[in-house]
């Protein structure tokens, strides 16, 4: 199963809320529901939300390319996807993970190529949350600020 063709747009203008929503709903939520991948649509649009070929007239691209200067702006969708795509490699498998802490949502993966593990956590609570990451007989503490997203990778 692939989660495809979701897009942000001018209707969702609060950057931090958008980042949290994308990570919670798409990166963590879809993959916890066994989606093999998440695709946002459109990848690149200009500052006028174009080119426009029908459908959503004010969708936002993962990146915005200025039609005059060519400058590229990485949008919140880019950073949400980056939390996974930089660390979760092709052929990685989702592995069991739990948080047990109100407001923290997470998903974990094992990379097939090197056996490394990746844990993505988003804090949807209105306050910081202390947490302890445990893997086997090893652990470390971490405090995740309200609305924050973090990615851990270890061997």
PLM feature spans:
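Substrate-binding and catalytic surfaces of secreted/luminal carbohydrate-active proteins
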Residues: 1-155
